[in-house]
Amino acid sequence: MLRLLLILLTVVGVVIVLVGVTSKLYRVPTSSMEPTLHCPKDDEIPGCRGDDADRIVVSRVWYRVRDPERGDVVAYELPARGVRRCGAEPGATFVHRIVALPGDRVEVRAGVVRIDGRRLEEDYVERGRMGGPSFRSQVIPDDKYVVLGDNRAQSCDSRAWGLVDRDDIIGPKIATYWPEDRISVR
């Protein structure tokens, strides 16, 4: 029995170390990714209730073995121009969805994304959350990405400050671990 307990504790310890080395944990600080990632509003205070916000696990190694894909929800370091436009702290980490890849011709109007002239199907964006600024038609250069919040009307994203460099992408969201009623993988 003691041997089984030691094996179990060793396995748990190894998992904790691996997660710590290969992943990073974040709390969702805004409603920009609603309804995919939740940050409940509070009428008494600006912003959202941090204690009830989704907590996510982001892989720091995933993009070492594969390229980012359209639809990935990613954490990234906000570029300097985004810090100014969004009123964020330098070094801030944002979480949004990749909607355009290098080589795509992308345009965003009234929250609707068009890739190479065709409307991008986005079942994760609710009709009432469309809108926000536009993004003029352009071809995305190598190692650059367009990221948007699923709550287009309330998101400070690529439409406000431009493209995200691949080197600034920390990694994709691989799990939601809090609150317990929203636990999910990928």
What are these regions (language model features)?
Residues 2-186:
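Soluble "head" domains of membrane/secretory-pathway proteins
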